[in-house]
Amino acid sequence: VPNKLDMNNIFCRAPFMHLYVGYDGRCRLCCVSKPNEKTKTLSAVDSSNFWDYWSGEYLTEVRNDMLNNVPRKECEPCYTIEDTGGKSFRNAFDIRHSHIDLQGKELFFPNDLDIRFSKLCNLKCRMCSESISSQLEKEIANNYSVLKQYRDQITQPVMSENNFKKILGNINSIDYIKVAGGEPSIMPEVESFLQAFIDNNRHTGDNAVNLLITTNCTNQNTKFEKLINQFSNVTLTVSFEGIGLVNNYIRSPSNFDILEQTLISYLKKHKCILNATIQAYNLPYLIEFVNWLKYINENFGQLDAFFMLLDQPGELACYNLSKSLRNYYVDMYLENIDFDATWLADSNLKSSLELLKKDQSEISNYRFVHRTKAFDHVRNQHIKDYLPEVFEDIQETYTTMAMPS
C-alpha cells in the first residue's frame, strides 16, 4: 500500500497529530491557520468536547482533504509562504514528525500541543489585542472613549479544569509542548503544567518532552527559570520587532536594553529562536534589526530568526504605508542584506520582502493613522519621536486627525 502522506504538496501532519488551543479556547489547525466556524471551543466545563473536536466531523473532513490533495482555505498562509520560496509551518511539522508514519490515520491523542493558558501579560504591544493581553485590556477599559473600536474582550476561560486534566492524563503521549501567551513566564498555570511533566519524569532522559516557550524577555522570573532549567530539550522563541526606540514604541512598556540582556542570559543555557513580524511600524528599520542579529550571533551564540508579514490587525500591515516608501526600503534590503547568513538562511525574510515587492497594493492610511494616534494619545507618546520615517509618510493625515477627549 503506498504511503499517501508523501503523494502531494497539500498534505500537512498537523491535523493528524497537533492540537492548538487559542486565547479564546477555540481550536484551530495550527497557530497560523485561518479560523473555521466548525472548530470547537474547549472552555466548556464538560471535557467530552475535547473528543468532539479531535475525532469529530471537522477534523475528519480536513484529514480527508489532506490525503486527497484538496487545498483548505484555513491553510492559505502556508501556501502563500511556500509559493514565494519560504519555509512554512507545514514544512516545519513535516520535518519535526517525519519519523512517524501515520498511514493516513490520526493519533489517538495529539502528541504535539500548542496551548495559550491565559492572556496574562505585562506588555501592551501595538499590534496586539485585549483578548491576548491583560495589560491592553486594562488600557482600553480605562480609555474607552478613545480606544473603544479596538475592544474585542473575551471573558471566558481558555481551558476548563477538566480539559486540563484530560491533557495531563495523556502526558506520556505528548512529545512536543508549545506554550505561549500572554506571557508564559508569569502565568501560574504554566508553572503547574511544567511541574506535572517534571513529576512524571518527562523533563529529562530518553523520554524527555520537547518544550517550546514563547517569551517577550521582559523579566527573568526565578521560579520560572528554575522550572525550565530542569528540562533537557528547551527552545525559547523570543519575540522582538526591532531594536532601541522601535522596540520600545511597538512593544510598550518594554525597555530594549533589558530585553537584550535577558536574551543574552537565555542564550547561555537554551536554544533560542527570534520571531518577528514585518509591519508598517518596523519596515523602515529592518536593516538595523538585521545588523543587531549579526552582532548577537557573532558574540553571544546562535540565534536563528523567523520573519512573517503581519496581516492582523490589517491597519498595521505594511500596505498602509505609501507604495513609494515600501519600495524604497524593500529594494534597499533585497540589494544589501546577506540572506545567506546562517541566522537568516531559513528566516523567510527574503521571501517576505519579495512578496511585498510583488504586491503593489496601496490602501488609505486612515485606519493605520487612527490606531496610531489613538494609542499615542492615551500613552502620551508621539510617533515622530520613535519612528520618524513612518511619521513623515503619514504626517498629513496624522496632523489633521482629531481625537475624542
Enumerate the language-model features and the residues they cover.
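Radical SAM enzyme [4Fe-4S]-AdoMet core and its adjacent flexible, acidic
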Residues: V1-S48, R116, E137, N229-Q230, ...
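Membrane-interface junctions of multi-pass transporters
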Residues: L5, K34-T80
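Short, intrinsically disordered, charge-biased short linear motifs at domain edges
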Residues: M17-Y20, E57-N68, F109-R116
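Local cysteine-cluster metal-coordination motifs and their immediate loop/turn environment
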Residues: R28-V32, P71-D83, L120-E130
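Recognition helices and adjacent regulatory flanks at domain boundaries
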Residues: P77, D83-D112, C121-L123
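Core AdoMet radical
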Residues: P110-L120, S131-M159, N172-P188, N200-T222, ...
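Eukaryote-biased activation of long, low-complexity terminal tails and linkers
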Residues: L147-N162, D175-I177, F193-D199, T204, ...
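Leucine-rich repeat
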Residues: N163-N170, A196-T204, L227-N229, Y266
